[in-house]
Amino acid sequence: MIFPVALIHPIQAPPTKKEEYTMLIDRREFLKLGSLAALSGSVPGLVHATSSTLATSSQPVPDGKADYTLRMGRSLVELAPDHIVPTTVFNGQFPGPLLRFKEGQQVVVDIHNDTDTPEQLHWHGQFLPVDVDGAAEEGTPYIPAHGMRRIAFTPGPAGFRFYHTHLTAADDLTLGQYSGLVGPVYIEPKREPGAYDREVFLTLKEFDPFFSKGGDMAMDFLSPGDRNRTLEERGETAMKNSLARGQPHGYEVGYQSFAINGRMRGHGEPVRVKAGERVLFHVLNGSATEIRSLALPGHHFKVVALDGNPVPHPAEVPVLWIGTAERVSAIVEMKHPGVWVLGDLADDDRNRGMGIVIEYAGHRGKPRWVSPRPFSWDYRRFAQPDARPVAPDDVIEMTFAKLNAADRGFNAWTINGVQFDMAAMKPMFHLRHGKRYRLRMHNASDDIHPMHLHRHSFEITRIAGQPTGGVIKDVAMLGGYQTMEVDFTADQLGLTLFHCHMQLHMDYGFMALFDCV
């Protein structure tokens, strides 16, 4: 959660990036046309000036009726009877429809774009070729404005994934993940992790975004909490020097409304349960920028999967902490009858909508909320005891840094001193197919960064100097002034995007490309 220092209201947006955005679209369309000529009729994709090609191109797209149809368009979302917001959604609803796939069974999807802006649709957490993954930086063709694109792919891996826009928003709070373009995906596994009676999907999302100045991000919920003194000194010195030069704090984004499954607390249908029932909650943090928490008074969550991947050590916790784009699958045994609020720990956010009512059969009345005791979120809790991760073939050192208010009042972000160039889109790291790599990430800022790797999953192997293993994810929260190590096998040829999943960070430089040959 961001605690704003000073709000700008009404919103005074910084100078627009429309001209830059138009230039980028034109360049990418040019590259797309070039790829069509180069590939002589094969599936369209972008060809970049790198050593890699679209070696893992998508499957031939069959004719006939699609298995699924997704339509991006403007709509009104009724968060509450007296609070209706305009935004862009899938199929006229928020969240987008739940898509259930079978692992290994090809699907055909028609994606319609009824907006005035070329769009991208990213299949988050799946191992897909670059021309369907849904990132322009990798080479995925745009879905043209008022146009359509049909794609075919084989879903995988099994588990809880999701789909969302992957458009640069910059200073436009109607675009990208500030919009309602997000929906859940569940790829049926051969065997479910844990026994349960039924499942419930929850998508957490904020609405009515606005710009604010400065603010501090709470991070005392993360464990281990040890900070690296060298990183802290570097980050704090850079901030002090910036402020001493008269620079204000960089823009942040806040929100006025909060919802679960598109309804503010108390304005949607409750989750109706029976005593003794075991409910598997699949929780998606669909936020553009926020870290969320959830608690259900009198109950515990048995976490069985993170980001759709079964954990080695399922464990009960009183609170879920979920970074931007993370997913948690947890079983709750209903053994405390009553009417309760399943909600965020932040009182302001919960009172403004971030909650849903859990109603036991035979019980009525005002939903109750009881704040839980302080609890630290630690990925190691779900790890393999005494895990000894396989030694990598190579280690890639990465340092993340913030340049306060450096881009028209917005914070700019760098990886190893380089701000990602949306015009050039050059790979920073070169990989060999089949090799195992360790990303050693050093965070020289006080922000938490939910780090995401496209087209792969990774194993968390060290957090703040503490070894661990066995937890497989595609997004992981890296604490302020902390280090984290994650291992992955470069088994996807071509370009792979790596970035902080906070829209405000990735739009201003916090991205890098891997090129695997």
Stretch-by-stretch model annotation:
Residues 8-9, 29-50:
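N-terminal export signals
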Residues 461-491:
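C-terminal soluble interaction/assembly domains
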Residues 297-310, 416-418, 444-471, 503-507, ...:
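Active/binding-pocket-proximal capping segment
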Residues 24, 34, 47-324, 330, ...:
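Histidine-centered copper-binding motifs that mark active-site loops
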